[in-house]
C-alpha cells in the first residue's frame, strides 16, 4: 500500500504522478494525512483505498472551516469548486 502525503510530496500534481506509477504496478493507495485533499485524491483513483480522518482535529477545525461530511463511514465530497474548504472568516477574527 502506497501512502504518499499530498501535502508533503510536492502537492496534488506530484501525488497524481505517484498514483500513476502505483497504478502501473497494481498497488493500492491510501494517502497519508487526512483532509479534503486526501479525500479528493482517493476519489480520483480506481485503486484508492481509504482516507485518514482525525475526529479531534476535525472538531477543532470545524470552528473555523467546513470539512467534507462523513455519513456511515462514507465521505460525501462537495460539488463546490476546488477542494471544498469553506473558511469562516468571522470565526477567525
Each model region followed by its residue ranges:
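Shared catalytic-loop signature of beta/alpha-barrel
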Residues: 1-81, 86
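Active-site microenvironment of metallo-dependent hydrolases
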Residues: 92-93
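Active-site and glycan-interaction determinants of carbohydrate-active enzymes
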Residues: 89
